[in-house]
Amino acid sequence: MKILLVDDERTEREGIRFLIEKFQFELEVAEAANGKLAMEYLQKYQDVDILLTDVKMPYMDGLQLAKYAKENRPDVIIIIFSAYSEFDYAKKACEVSAVNYLLKPIEVEEFKQVMEHVIALCRQKKQWKEQKENLLVADKKLLLYRLFNTKESVTEIVEKLKEYKINLENKYICFVSIETRN
């Protein structure tokens, strides 16, 4: 799993990296010094699982970054941290689907608990994705079986293909059913 750590203060990033290593979270850590660089990273690399971002940064703040991630990378789990204790910031973090809002200075035990929860959530999401992909493969195999081993109408077959987003427009397709006699 990979975490993208975003803060304009290098010492903050180093401190969080230290905690990730201390608790042996087995995360690959990528860093960005502001929201704009982090957005570019998210555009370039598809392997980020967790986005941990500060709020106040130059060029693009953490809330704008989280909004971008929510809209363009909905699979990424977002955690926001900040020195702002006002409820309005926590509310804005919720609006961009952040799973947690940590206050600076970050409490070590709270950070550990949040990260354990988020890592478990990442694992669960990956497991669900694999299960969904396996079900789609099994369902497609069933579809192929039905195409060649049943007497479904062409309309039923075309509808099933559309469910899989297989576009048949402007394509010449012929279904032939041949029965063999022994």
Where are these regions (language model features)?
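Short helical segment in ABC ATPase nucleotide-binding domains corresponding to the A-loop/adjacent helical element
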Residues: R17, E21
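CheY-like receiver
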Residues: K22, M39-L135
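Interdomain helical linkers/hinges and coiled-coil/dimerization scaffolds
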Residues: I106-N182
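Conserved Asp/Asn-Gly motif in the active-site loop of CheY-like receiver
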Residues: V29-K36
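Conserved acidic segment of CheY-like receiver
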Residues: M1-T11, I16
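Conserved sequence signature across two-component system core domains
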Residues: V6-D7, A32, L51
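Switch/coupling loops of ABC transporter nucleotide-binding domains
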Residues: M1, L27, V76
